[in-house]
Design a protein with these regions (language model features):
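Short helix/loop capping segments that flank catalytic or ligand/cofactor-binding pockets
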Residues: 66-68, 174-175, 232-233
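C-terminal catalytic subdomain
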Residues: 1-2, 7, 126-132, 194-266
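Helix-loop-helix
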Residues: 78-120, 233-257
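Short glycine- and acidic-rich boundary segments immediately preceding or forming the N-terminal edge
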Residues: 1-44, 111-139, 157, 182-188
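Short hydrophobic beta-strand that contains or immediately precedes a catalytic carboxylate
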Residues: 56-60, 165, 222-224
Length: 266
């Protein structure tokens, strides 16, 4: 068994692990400006590996909402618990999973709204900034997300059942060995999609996909937030050292953003 949850105030270098038939790499870093200010990151990455099953969630808090990190952490924690609760049989039915996930997300609004409503603002805030934040509070905290589950169904062939769901501008790239075969359709046009603590899903429905419906075999996936756009153009699987260097280089960019990265192979 292996679990990971982001510490939104600490960087996690690219780390490699082999566990439960899976080989995976992961890393987390706040934007350069956020690190300098010793502030909280907006991304939240969480995953769990056990009994030949890998469940993961990556949430990217919307910075223009009320403390996007709140929605990111809350939603990631809840989605991971949901993915872990689903049976192997249920997860094979993409349509059933999509309907269940949609209902689950709607059911989180009341609890999430209470968390936002009772969140205490820092005392040192200026009256103007406090007014701005109170206005944002009324509209809720928001986050984009991608989540999924991989279940190994045959040890010999390493065949797996995969379910993916996404809302927002998140990256999911699928590989068959060292060859990239597909990119899960969550692109720039989806940047207005997100989940809100006040309104639930916004600007469109969840996009889902499954291994049975992809029409293309794959045994590896990259999942990462838009802060790691530097690897979008890479057409081969980068070594860990290069990933770490690209992550470090991004901190000095004027457009530096939080980075979450997960590479799962089976």
């Amino acid at each position: 068994m292996f679990s990971f949850t982001s510490d939104q105030k600490t960087e996690t270098p690219i780390t490699s692990v082999y566990q439960e038939r899976f080989t995976f790499r992961y890393g987390y870093a706040r934007a350069g400006e956020t690190q300098q200010a010793d502030d909280i990151g907006q991304d939240y990455l969480a995953f769990h590996v056990e009994n030949r099953s890998f469940q993961f969630v990556l949430c990217d808090g919307v910075s223009l909402s009320f403390y996007g990190n709140i929605a990111a952490q809350f939603l990631a924690t809840k989605l991971l618990a949901w993915l872990r609760s689903v049976s192997v049989e249920e997860v094979r039915d993409e349509r059933t999973m999509a309907v269940a996930l949609h209902a689950y997300l709607g059911g989180l609004v009341e609890e999430a709204t209470e968390i936002v409503d009772t969140y205490r603002l820092p005392r040192a805030l200026s009256p103007l900034l406090r007014d701005v934040l109170e206005e944002k509070r009324r509209n809720g905290s928001e986050a984009m997300f991608v989540c999924g589950r991989v279940d190994i169904i045959d040890d010999w062939s390493k065949q797996a059942n995969v379910f993916l769901a996404c809302s927002g501008d998140m990256r999911v790239r699928l590989w068959d060995g060292t060859r990239e075969v597909a990119c899960f359709p969550c692109d720039e046009e989806d940047r207005h999609q997100r989940w809100s603590t006040k309104n639930g899903l916004m600007s469109g429905d969840i996009k889902t996909a499954s291994s049975s419906g992809m029409g293309q075999p794959f045994n590896r996936m990259f999942v990462y937030s838009d802060g790691f756009a530097a690897i979008d153009s890479l057409r081969s699987i980068p070594k860990t050292e290069r990933l770490q260097n690209l992550m470090a280089e991004s901190f000095s960019s004027p457009t530096s953003d939080d980075i979450s990265f997960l590479d799962i192979a089976w």
